[in-house]
Amino acid sequence: FSDPLDMIAMDDLSIITGMQIEIRVTTVKDVSQALDRFYGNSEAMKVADQFAAERREKYGNNKDGKEESEEVKQAPIVRLVNQIIEQAVHKRTSDIHFEPLENQLRIRFRVDGVLQEAMRHDISLLSAMVARIKIVGGMDISEKRKPQDGRMTQIVDRQEYDIRVSILPTVYGEKIVMRLAQKTALSRDKKDLGFEPEELHRFEDILKHPNGIMLVTGPTGSGKSTTLYTALSELNTEEVNIITVEDPVEANINGINQVQVNAKAGLTFAAALRSILRQDPDIIMIGEIRDGETAGIAVESAITGHLVVSTLHTNSAASTISRLADMGIENYLISDAVIGVIAQRLLRRVCPRCKRMVPADDLEKKELGIPEEKWGEEVLIPHIEPNEECLECGGAGYKGRIGIYEIMQMSPALKRIIATGGTAEELEKEAIKEGMNTLVMSANKQVLKGITTLQEVHRVAYDN
């Protein structure tokens, strides 16, 4: 039995939790049920044990004795959350969604850009899971009415993963989304980005400029950060001072000065950029241009002798110029500052085990940009025959992704169109004349190579 007069214990609890302690009388049974519900849920224990058994069967026991012993000692809910993250990593997941429904907790994994249901559990697991994730993510465990953001790390198969956490109150409980990123995965060799030879040449040419602004554009999850970090790795030498301002810092790069935006402390993108300009930078990376003030400072920095790389959310390379104009940047400044724009998407690769090459019909040949006079020639394109038991893709029909790009390298003709207020359509037409592939053109090449399907092109690049 507890002692309601133990003031020392009450003070200790108050300090640890940051809350005021109130004494209540209850039964041992109610206390046990509360502990089981929030910290030792029998459902969590059952699911955690099931996960452990499945992992041993599928992957073998790749943990040493000490790791295995420590895992067994963990509370069931701790084991369960860790095992869900581990399973997500093994399935190449970018985001984990914990979604409270009326009577169930649905967990979905975003694999290769598409959400897939991974499991469902009893809704009673939700509160304990939320509490565990809030504690590890550095969030307020008592706040359930407001959205919260946090960050945590976890080691899976001896690789460290950075996990960004977002929690949103919904009618059935708090919804959690975890974004997983392997700390070493963002920076890669430029040849591994999936550029065609001509595109790689254009990319290298843009990075050779001592000043100007290079913009990478596309929707969330299109690989913009990977392209930016790869560019920075290319530029990172002893002779240059590189400073980044990011929200959040997605990966640490040795030799580069990285600044984390902190709006609560008044450190916005614009405020950070003003300070960075007093730090004698050669190259500046801005995680995202979100407003006119940031855009103005970025363009001014590019014109005054700095190389600036950043991202925007637009659908195409040409429309990026219009977006800057909409933010209040004068056309002559855009023309002077911008040295190149890269629009990009990620297409799913067709699973080699589920792929079957079939002749394209006339409509498909037309979509692929094949001239009508060549429609009589046989053209083979991939179709999927999904197999639920496929060990490569698990029945999805796709495994892995490849980048497609639209690289608009500035030329005197393009600069004239921008300076005179030309439209995005005029810009794109001139860029194509100068050799630029649009996203759809790049995607069609991957279909003809047998790497992806026309259905995937429709899903990802059809709006272009």
Predicted regions and their residues:
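Switch/coupling sub-region of P-loop NTPases
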Residues: 200, 204-215, 225-349
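Charged, alpha-helical scaffolding/interaction elements associated with membrane systems
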Residues: 90-91, 157, 278-279, 304, ...
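NTP-binding/hydrolysis catalytic cores, primarily Walker-type P-loop NTPases
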Residues: 373-464
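Alpha-helical scaffold elements adjacent to nucleotide-binding pockets in ATP/GTP-utilizing enzyme cores
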Residues: 12, 16, 34-37, 132, ...
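Short, conserved loop/turn and helix-capping segments at secondary-structure boundaries
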Residues: 120-127, 193-197, 266, 314-318, ...
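Cys/His-rich Zn2+-binding cysteine-cluster or related metal-binding knuckle/ribbon modules and their
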Residues: 314-411
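N-terminal "pre-motor" subdomain/linker immediately upstream of P-loop NTPase catalytic cores
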Residues: 1-44, 53-222, 438, 445-464
